[in-house]
């Protein structure tokens, strides 16, 4: 039988009457060190047999390990006898190390559900889950990683829950959010904390060493006052960069609000399919430079047919002026584009565009940092997409510790693979 269990050899193998095979193995060497004093002994006190779990091998396999119980060679040692332990079968192990490696590879590397992996390997769910949980200890300490750029973003942990107060009888809505902290240079998730307020992020940052915090130079966030407060309070040397995606999203929301308001003012109802502005509402949100000549002609037709006040076109122009700011390559270009943006806002003269312009002005220092450094939350958003895939694979999680373990291990594996395939580049997490 070719069993290939490292440091072990097969001494017997029989086919079982009901199918499968029983394989009896023994270690290549008898000698082992005492777990208390470390003195190596080869004197056998007795032999014992232990049934252990191993990876499937040409069908169902029942593995029996013949272990020697050794006598400690040190007379002053308090332990008289001990059982042999190896790298594949540590002390009190009931599964081989290669089985645990196989479980971890299937769950983390290939993203399979723990329940499905446990069933395919013939072990209990808790055995597979404990293997995943124990792998967290093998991850490098965050304080030991050389991190200079961070990305912070939130994601919803699970569906909205309603809880009833036993004293008042009132119901309260709870949205379970988690905040993801990512190394934006390589996309590795460094931490996942409960909540999306400043206290959650501050708690994680203050747990890092002062030297680690002093090395961080740029932090990319969405336009969140809570994240901004946490970063400015805990990272004194870091500049804040606001993510361009979220700024464009705010611009699109501004256009949508103007369109909805005009629909009520002009038609005294919500938009319908017969209204060109509603029928082509997604066209209004597209970047003008991404449109084909046919799309640009259709956009002009929509604004000419369903924008009697000109406010919708003005709001669209403000949104496009913002995109020109974000497309700038230098601070001088950005400031010149900001001047044109302000002119568009004055010409639009609507409440929606004024509020939008106030937001851009408030976050202008962070916008300049984004343009100067090029740091965005793109890899943070990519990490959140991978996190959502993990959540869907597990059909949701009731235990947040298990959820965070899957996220950190999966992200560390992807970052390690990225380093192996990107040698010589700047994509390095260490």
Residue ranges and their predicted role:
Residues 36, 42, 171-175, 183-188, ...:
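Acidic/histidine-rich catalytic cores and adjacent linkers
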Residues 42, 127, 131-218, 225-230:
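RNase H-like nuclease fold core
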Residues 21-31, 60-67:
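Short, flexible, mixed-charge glycine/proline-rich loop motifs
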Residues 38-41, 46-150, 154-161, 213-214, ...:
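Short, positively charged, Gly/Tyr-enriched micro-motifs
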Residues 3-29:
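N-terminal cysteine/histidine-rich coordination modules
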Residues 135, 166-167, 233-239, 255-259:
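Short secondary-structure boundary/capping segments
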Residues 244-268:
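Short alpha-helix plus adjacent loop in nuclease-associated cores
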Residues 117, 151, 220, 240-243:
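A structural signal for short, well-ordered beta-strand segments and their strand-loop junctions
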